């Protein structure tokens, strides 16, 4: 896949004064309960990060509710955020693909990230693992071994992704093209079903978020052949990077970020950004992210907007190069 700047240069958070201070002495940014929508079910990686963030920015509002709205590839909360309340009480935490990739793979997407949303901050960076299940014999220990096995077993050569037109889908396409091998793509609705079918021997391989498969890798039920990040995962130090394995086509990470509706007052956006950045400075917050192989990463709203623009351009070129036809 085309290379890009994976990590964000941090700058100091914008200060915010003029907080709403209720009689209890709490310094809440908004004087009503807030809601963070997430487009994936409970137990998913975005859900984990959303709930963790809600716990650590609890002084932002009297209470913060996590609203799971799974389905449609994670797009439902973004559809609901468009034109939503602009008082800081409505937010969405989403992976970057729903914002920067989906405009190029869906013909009738109901939102425009640069027009309809106000970016607040990234929260973390997410890496994937290229893993194989028990259908692949134990002597397959590297990506090169897997490619050789695919050539010898074309009917079994398959990989799962969280859905058609997702980043892991394109990672698999990139790997197959660079290696000159055919692999059947099997789309799923998220990472956990991929792992279930890997364990059951229904598919040979998968590209999944580390946290979805980590317990099974550690238990030896599935084997991780490469991580997609530029550096090895600290929690799996023996797993090589895709580049180390000789297949940079598999390289790539994704951000999770927080948004509010376009038109939300700048002082509220700045205050929420400050609350997120404060959480990202807490050792306990960083430790809990690291335990699931998420890398804490914040930025200013302006930096986040620029990242989205860069990703939109990168994915436009990538999707075009793959000849992918936009879906309805």
What is each PLM-predicted segment?
Residues 6-26:
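N-terminal export signals
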Residues 26-114, 156, 164, 181-207, ...:
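N-terminal (or domain-start) structured segment
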Residues 31-33, 177, 181, 266-328:
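An extracytoplasmic/periplasmic, membrane-proximal ligand-sensing/linker region
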Residues 83-89, 104-193, 255-288:
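Hinge/capping helix and adjacent helix->loop/strand transition within the periplasmic-binding protein
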Residues 97-108, 174-178, 205-239:
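A ligand-binding cleft/hinge motif common to bilobed small-molecule-binding domains
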Residues 125, 142, 213-281, 310-313, ...:
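C-terminal lobe and pocket-closing loops
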